[in-house]
């Protein structure tokens, strides 16, 4: 937190179990930096990691030779004013020959394809919307499946929508057009996935889809009749303008069980008051 004097210090060590040796990797660059391992190489001869500046607006993607401890900086990125840790994602493929890197360099979070030397090969996603977490990767078909936000008109921009994109060229295809929050679980072949989607005012639906987005079959659907018989009412979704008169703010409204439209009721505003975001599930 701001003002703290004693901060965690991160180090990276290479431990050889057979030789019974432990060596510290010379990965220091910034004071009070944060180090995170991405993954080892396929043969164990290298290790990919990322280091973040304390101000969380700069990041390096690096690789270290596990024998010589030589560190090579592959990608250096500056994201002002702040790098979104929850959305940041770096994927190493083909033993480091392909690197999928997420950046907000355009003002929107998107994915970029780099080679093993840190050279940009191509843009994967682009446009006035946000590419989020990776859901799955088909290494054979060189296809990435990812969540996106704010791309589809008329859909709450906070809803997770699933897209697929080629690793080697720009462009995405929407796989979940239903106006709801989606969660995808892929089968190992990546040919099919289970799509679970819902809203606060819509019961969950669970369907099996192919990797083209076609519904193969419905797997499960909850029975909410008893819940409604007991008097439960779904909340109402709404959108209002912020103080600037331009920005949409999305929320939900729970009305009393005995709501009377002819009466006046007090309003209780309930949001998460954290210093970094305010969020209401819709």
Question: In which residue ranges do the predicted regions lie?
Answer:
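Beta-propeller blade termini and top-face loops
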Residues: 158-161, 282
């Amino acid at each position: 937190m701001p003002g703290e004097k004693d901060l965690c210090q991160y180090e990276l060590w290479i431990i050889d179990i057979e030789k019974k040796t432990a060596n510290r990797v010379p990965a220091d660059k910034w004071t009070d930096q944060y180090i995170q391992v991405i993954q080892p190489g396929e043969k164990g001869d290298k290790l990919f990691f990322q280091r973040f500046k304390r101000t969380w607006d700069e990041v390096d993607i690096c690789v270290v030779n596990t024998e010589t401890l030589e560190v090579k900086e592959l990608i250096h990125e500056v994201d002002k004013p702040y790098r979104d840790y929850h959305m940041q994602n770096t994927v190493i493929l083909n033993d480091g020959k392909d690197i999928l890197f997420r950046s907000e360099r355009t003002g929107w979070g998107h994915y970029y394809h780099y080679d093993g030397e840190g050279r940009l090969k191509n843009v994967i996603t682009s446009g006035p919307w946000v590419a989020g977490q990776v859901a799955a990767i088909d290494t054979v078909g060189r296809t990435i499946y990812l969540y996106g936000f704010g791309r589809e008109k008329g859909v709450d921009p906070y809803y997770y929508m699933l897209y697929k994109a080629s690793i080697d060229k720009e462009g995405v295809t929407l796989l979940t057009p239903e106006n709801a929050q989606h969660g995808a679980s892929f089968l190992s072949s990546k040919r099919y996935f289970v799509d679970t989607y819902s809203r606060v005012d819509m019961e969950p639906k669970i369907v099996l889809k192919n990797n083209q987005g076609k519904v193969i079959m419905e797997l499960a659907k909850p029975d909410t009749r008893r819940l409604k018989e007991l008097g439960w009412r779904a909340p109402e979704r709404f959108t209002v303008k912020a103080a600037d008169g331009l920005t949409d703010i999305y929320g939900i409204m729970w009305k009393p069980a005995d709501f009377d439209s002819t009466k006046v009721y007090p309003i209780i505003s309930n949001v998460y008051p954290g210093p970094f975001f305010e969020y209401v599930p819709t």
